[in-house]
Amino acid sequence: GLLLLWSLVTQRGIKEIDTRVAVQLINYQDALVLDVRDDSEYAAGHLPNSKHVPSEKIEERWTELEKFKDKPIVVIYQGGVRSNRPSLVLKKNGFSQVFNLMGGIDAWKRASLPIVKR
């Protein structure tokens, strides 16, 4: 199943990016940071100005993101592993620039990048 999921992700054009590329998208292309972790993970620390939509709610709440359809969207999960489903939902609904942060919030913290707590 994992190999199939990987091919789906690459077929649909969802790119994995590292923290350096994510910072460039955020700073220079006004990317939306979409945090799809659960409430407790998000409260423990998240990227500044991120939008929080838990993974299991993405099917019903993706319309909240409609105004970002043509902007880059950087999807954040705990370790980067579970963010494929939300990314696929966004792609399926016409979002053109969806990126998964490789290593998720863990990679962001390892790079000593800014984190805020609720």
Regions found by a protein language model. Give the residues of each.
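Metallo-beta-lactamase
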Residues: 76-77
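Rhodanese-like catalytic fold shared by cysteine-dependent sulfurtransferases
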Residues: 1-21, 25-31, 39-72, 81-118
